[in-house]
Amino acid sequence: DLYTSKGLFRAAVPSGASTGIYEALELRDNDKTRFMGKGVSKAVAHVNKTIAPALISKNISVVEQEKIDRLMLEMDGSENKSKFGANAILGVSLAVCKAGAAEKGVPLYRHIADLAGNPEVILPVPAFNVINGGSHAGNKLAMQEFMILPVGAESFKEAMRIGAEVYHNLKNVIKEKYGKDATNVGDEGGFAPNILENKEALELLKNAINKAGYSDKIVIGMDVAASEFYRDGKYDLDFKSPDDPSRYITPDQLADLYKSFVKNYPVVSIEDPFDQDDWAAWKKFTASVGIQVVGDDLTVTNPKRIAKAVDDKACNCLLLKVNQIGSVTESLQACKLAQSNGWGVMVSHRSGETEDTFIADLVVGLCTGQIKTGAPCRSERLAKYNQILRIEEEL
């Protein structure tokens, strides 16, 4: 909570389930007697006892986002924000950004656009994660997210309607094939039917899209989160079963599987197809396919990792997660670095989301044109989509 003469500005920081090893540090108490070790009293104390007094004494205006973020980074002094915790720094950074917009008397998305030097704003295409697997779900499915992108919609409002209708058609398709309990939802609001074959998930999507009557307006995206099932240079597509190295497949075999998906289904975007350090596989794959290849665990919204990925031509789109890097200023830098190198950028939520809607304004202000913030289900996901609907009405 940040108070200025204009009122109260509040931010909440999300948390990820499948985190990349190069992400900024999320500071937890590790006191097993409280919240299973996941308490954040240390991070909160850093805000109240160190960061807040410093910002108040320096008397910097809340519109000076970069100055405030730089001050916090200097005070922390570590490479990955391990002293204060990225969760402490980001909470303040987000609240400052909201306060800055109010100080200027403009909507948050305009303030963000100003900070990024964008004269215009753009509404995004939503990527709805409607089938969940991987570390987000209790099924056997290895690949983490299967998304629908209503690229043929004329407006965000229409995109929401298409997404909702396909989602409910998918629910019926799954119920008919696997029974009612297969329609329980995963962390991000998507369904998590107990299937093993990743192709089966694509088949279910294709079916639901056709039933809803939108086969001409929707394309499919995937987030494989392959770092979660990388084993000794190979990949285990049945990683939730007892370990058996004989079933591991090579990066080339995995790449061929992706190519078969692209050939047989309208798959136009694949995120984290390989492990976060399997640079050779990324490079080879991106050069050989004409689709969007998104870096998440690979790039962790970190300008240094992005620069390496640009040099290596490892991918062609950045997944932007504010809590991977831990400040608004660095998030804008990461976005601009990617865009200036001709990459796409997709703004993203985390599996452990909050009701905070900052990323809805962020995606509009940064003009990235793409956002993924879950299925049209669960209010912490819908909060973001509803905020974009409101922004569209305003514009």
Curated annotation (Swiss-Prot):
Cofactor needs: Mg(2+)
Gene3D superfamilies: Enolase-like C-terminal domain, Enolase-like, N-terminal domain
Pathway participation: Carbohydrate degradation; glycolysis; pyruvate from D-glyceraldehyde 3-phosphate: step 4/5
Catalytic residues identified in the record: E188, K321
Catalytic class of the enzyme: lyase
Chief place where the protein resides: cytoplasm
Full protein name: Enolase
Co-factor binding details: Mg(2+) is required for catalysis and for stabilizing the dimer.
Known EC number: 4.2.1.11
Residues noted as binding Mg(2+) in the record, renumbered to the chain: D223, E271, D296
